[in-house]
Amino acid sequence: MAVKIRLKRMGAKKSPFYRIVVADSRSPRDGRFIEQVGHYNPVAKPEAEVRINEELALKWLADGAKPSDTVRNLFSKAGIMEKFHNAKNAK
């Protein structure tokens, strides 16, 4: 089972927010997911709001889940990708 960490679109028309979820790569974008890792609100003022459960994100990355490009960028800004690579190279 190929597992991805990706964004699930929520919210009203023209006012989206996203949940960062772990899902099977074959399931639809807004369909079934395994676990919610955080959320991302690009419309929030004064700047975009991002909340990520770092512990869960690192656990899923260690288990082999592949992040989408956007999620990888969000994780990089939060410092999660750096922690993951440091832990991976320390072994």
From Swiss-Prot:
GO biological process entries: translation
Gene Ontology CC annotations of this record: cytoplasm; small ribosomal subunit
Keywords linked to the UniProt accession: Ribonucleoprotein, Ribosomal protein
GO molecular function terms attached to this record: structural constituent of ribosome
Keyword Ribosomal protein: yes
Family that this chain belongs to: Belongs to the bacterial ribosomal protein bS16 family.
NCBIfam families: S16
Protein name: Small ribosomal subunit protein bS16
Annotated organism of origin: Exiguobacterium sp. (strain ATCC BAA-1283 / AT1b)
Highest classification ranks of the organism: Bacteria, Bacillati, Bacillota, Bacilli, Bacillales
Gene: rpsP
